[in-house]
Structure formats: C-alpha cells, structure tokens
Amino acid sequence: SSALLLYFNPEITITRGNKVPEDFEGIIFDIGRGKYDHHQRDSRIRENGIPYAAFGLLWEELGTEILGEELAAKFDESFIQPLDINDNTGEKNELATLIGNFNPSWDVENGENEAFSRAVQTAGMILVNMFEKYKGNERAEKRVEEILAAHNSSVLSGEKSESEAKILVFPEFVPCQKQLRETDIAFIIFPSNRGGYCIQPLKKEHSLNYLSLIHI
C-alpha cells in the first residue's frame, strides 16, 4: 500500500503507527476504521467473493489513473487479489513472503523503520516493473492485431498460399503466443537478436506443431 501511494505521489511522507492522531490530515490505511481499513466487520468484499485488503481498496481508487480502466481491472485480478487474499487469510503468497522477510528478527531491538523503508523500496521497484509489463503487453496485443490483420488480408487476396497462411512473419519480436493460440497460425517467424531469424511453433493446448527444416 505504501509503495503504491509513493508511486502515485513520490512527495508524500508515510508515517507508521497503531493509532491515528486526532489532528492528522492525510490518507489513513490499514488502521482507523476508515475507507482504507479492512479490519472491520463490514469490510468490503468483491463480487467474486475475494475480500478487499488496504492494498485493494487503494488500488480501486488509484488504479485507473495509473493503468486505465481495462488494465487496472486485469491488474487487480492477477496481482492485487492474491495479495489481498494473503493479507486477509494468511494464504501463502511468494511476493508477500518476500516482502515479509524484510521484517527484523524477533530479538532485534529497533530497526523496524529501516526494515520497513527497505521493504517499501523493493515493493516499489516491483510495482514499477509490473506496470511497465502490463503496458507493454497492451502495446504488444495491438501490434499483433495489426500484423495479423495484414496477414489475413494477404491470404484472402491470394497473395499468400494455403501453406503460407499458417505462418505469420513479424518484422520484429513481439510477445504473441497467448494471443495467437486460438487462431489457425501454426508458426511464427521473427528476426533473431543473434542475426538471421527465429522460427517458433504456436503452443496449442491439444496439439503440437512440427516442421522439418533443412540444417544449414
């Protein structure tokens, strides 16, 4: 939650505590029985039955401004919700365990604030990488749609033969396996960063694509 708020506004100051000061003005989360505190009997639950934690409540408020409505919903489902489940139930989550390992040992005096700062910094880097990954995937989907549309047009016009119809050539590498899985494309070709070209079969759920190639 702290990492998300700092991503949204790096100028804010995060203050830790178990009680909200009477004169406090700012965003309060995880305590205080307010909008972003899930430690309440009437705490909110998603339509799919997954309860919100503070992270999810803050993401609901800020996520669309970071990723847009569609991507924010996908990010909530795949990234936020598993962490909210962990926060609410203790169900194992590798990322939550990673961040939790920043907590100092039980017999170490003080050091909690420093450990918290390192944990937030690490969580912040993870968030930045995840945001960029989701944005990149969205750009890839649009690029694949463009290339596939041009390919299908060439097939319909007769410019490409029946055998060529199942081979999609990319002018550059674009992540596409998942997007093309339900199409008739069997192989993709794209430039290799080592020179020449790479040929990959499409990974179909119930079949394998094989092609004998001449060894050069």
Label for each model-derived stretch:
Residues 49-178, 190-194:
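A structured phosphate/pyrophosphate-recognition subdomain
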Residues 2-72:
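Glycine/small-residue-rich interface belts in oligomeric ring/scaffold proteins
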Residues 214-216:
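Conserved small/polar residues in nucleotide/adenosyl-binding loops
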Residues 33, 40, 174, 193, ...:
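A broadly conserved detector of short glycine/acidic/proline-rich loop/turn motifs that flank catalytic sites
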Residues 185-192, 208-210:
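Gly/Ser/Thr-rich active-site loops/lids in small-molecule metabolic enzymes
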Residues 3-6, 181-184, 204:
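Short, solvent-exposed amphipathic alpha-helical segments in soluble enzyme
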Residues 200-212:
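A C-terminal functional module that forms or caps the active site or interfaces directly
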Residues 12-13, 26-27, 165-168, 185-188, ...:
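Structural motif
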